[in-house]
């Protein structure tokens, strides 16, 4: 029988399929980011660089200079920053501190501050939580509050493989942050548990400008169920 924790490796050709599907943001910061080592990270980055005019790829880096930059994409005149963080990379350790963005409170605050200076809206892709659990754990709630206090507009969570709640979290400056703790799986279910029944959580929202400030409004939450 197979043993050990699974290592993932996906053909680079799938990138074109994701672009054709309509994705324009991709987060490389997750617990499998180093499954294929530094070469895998390099391949990942160079694959998405081919689509840089269509997709903003973030979360893993080949240099400190690239790591310091705030990833921003302009959509219909709105500058959207995407910050990405993961709880870890399983048993794999990066050669450099800048390779993968992991959860660090001080760095998050610095990143968000820079992002707010350079963009209109700040999104965070957070790879966190416990697999198969429908409720956020204490660490997720802790960082959701950190994101809100820093002024993040929207947090999109991944990793649990099942849908978790969507909440507004109040920040210390009177702002509100929309937090989707876990969107479930977009394409594949799992072989155990009820993941295959909770295929995808979808959030629709509008970004509007009021009094020179951009706001997240008209939030609609939908969960799509996979037929069995």
Q: Predicted regions: what is each one?
A:
Residues 1-227:
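Acidic, metal/ion-coordinating pockets
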């Amino acid at each position: 029988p197979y043993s050990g924790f699974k290592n993932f490796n996906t053909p680079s050709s799938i990138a074109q399929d994701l672009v054709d599907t309509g994705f324009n943001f991709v987060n490389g910061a997750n617990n499998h980011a180093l499954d294929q080592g530094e070469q895998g990270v390099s391949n990942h980055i160079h694959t998405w660089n081919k689509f840089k005019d269509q997709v903003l790829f973030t979360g893993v880096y080949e240099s400190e200079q690239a790591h310091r930059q705030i990833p921003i994409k302009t959509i219909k005149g709105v500058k959207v920053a995407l910050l990405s963080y993961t709880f870890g990379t399983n048993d794999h350790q990066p050669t450099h501190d800048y390779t993968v963005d992991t959860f660090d409170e001080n760095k998050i605050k610095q990143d968000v501050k820079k992002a707010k200076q350079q963009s209109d809206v700040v999104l965070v892709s957070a790879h966190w939580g416990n697999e198969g659990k429908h409720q956020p754990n204490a660490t997720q709630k802790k960082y959701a509050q950190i994101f809100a206090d820093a002024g993040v507009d929207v947090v999109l969570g991944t990793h649990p493989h099942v849908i978790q709640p969507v909440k507004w979290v109040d920040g210390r400056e009177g702002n509100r942050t929309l937090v989707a703790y876990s969107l479930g799986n977009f394409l594949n279910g799992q072989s155990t548990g009820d993941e295959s029944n909770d295929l995808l959580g979808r959030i629709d929202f509008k970004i509007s400008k009021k009094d020179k400030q951009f706001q997240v409004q008209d939030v609609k939450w939908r969960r799509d169920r996979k037929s069995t």
